[in-house]
Amino acid sequence: MARFVAVALLVLLSLSGLEAIQHAPKIQVYSRHPAENGKPNFLNCYVSGFHPSDIEVDLLKNGKKIEKVEHSDLSFSKDWSFYLLYYTEFTPNDKDEYACRVSHVTFSTPKTVKWDRNM
């Protein structure tokens, strides 16, 4: 019984130590298919390698939040860092600008990454 309590305590201490680790998210913004003006596509924002899991992600059109956005379930990698995919349908053109804005404890202010149609 004492051995079980000691092991349980060790596990709890190890898990609480994970919360102290902070890793900034890597942000990648891309379209599902090569961009063609007037042709429907999907805009993706892949956010990975972050810890802790609390994060806010917004897709933007001309600096304004896009309301109809879907996302994957929060998942974690072998190193216990987290990743998410946010996406929405959009139709690219020459006048609109798209971006992904991320708020995380590792950033003093939200970070915005613009979509580059040539990537």
Curated annotation (Swiss-Prot):
<dbReference type="InterPro" id="IPR015707">
    <property type="entry name" value="B2Microglobulin"/>
</dbReference>
<keyword id="KW-0732">Signal</keyword>
<dbReference type="Pfam" id="PF07654">
    <property type="entry name" value="C1-set"/>
</dbReference>
<comment type="subunit">
    <text>Heterodimer of an alpha chain and a beta chain. Beta-2-microglobulin is the beta-chain of major histocompatibility complex class I molecules.</text>
</comment>
<comment type="similarity">
    <text>Belongs to the beta-2-microglobulin family.</text>
</comment>
<dbReference type="InterPro" id="IPR007110">
    <property type="entry name" value="Ig-like_dom"/>
</dbReference>
<dbReference type="InterPro" id="IPR013783">
    <property type="entry name" value="Ig-like_fold"/>
</dbReference>
<comment type="function">
    <text>Component of the class I major histocompatibility complex (MHC). Involved in the presentation of peptide antigens to the immune system.</text>
</comment>
<keyword id="KW-0391">Immunity</keyword>
<dbReference type="InterPro" id="IPR050160">
    <property type="entry name" value="MHC/Immunoglobulin"/>
</dbReference>
<dbReference type="InterPro" id="IPR036179">
    <property type="entry name" value="Ig-like_dom_sf"/>
</dbReference>
<dbReference type="GO" id="GO:0002474">
    <property type="term" value="P:antigen processing and presentation of peptide antigen via MHC class I"/>
</dbReference>
<keyword id="KW-0490">MHC I</keyword>
<feature type="domain" description="Ig-like C1-type">
    <location>
        <begin position="25"/>
        <end position="114"/>
    </location>
</feature>
<dbReference type="GO" id="GO:0042612">
    <property type="term" value="C:MHC class I protein complex"/>
</dbReference>
<dbReference type="InterPro" id="IPR003597">
    <property type="entry name" value="Ig_C1-set"/>
</dbReference>
<keyword id="KW-0964">Secreted</keyword>
<keyword id="KW-1015">Disulfide bond</keyword>
<feature type="signal peptide">
    <location>
        <begin position="1"/>
        <end position="20"/>
    </location>
</feature>
<keyword id="KW-0393">Immunoglobulin domain</keyword>
<dbReference type="GO" id="GO:0006955">
    <property type="term" value="P:immune response"/>
</dbReference>
<feature type="disulfide bond">
    <location>
        <begin position="45"/>
        <end position="100"/>
    </location>
</feature>
<dbReference type="GO" id="GO:0005576">
    <property type="term" value="C:extracellular region"/>
</dbReference>
<dbReference type="InterPro" id="IPR003006">
    <property type="entry name" value="Ig/MHC_CS"/>
</dbReference>
<protein>
    <recommendedName>
        <fullName>Beta-2-microglobulin</fullName>
    </recommendedName>
</protein>
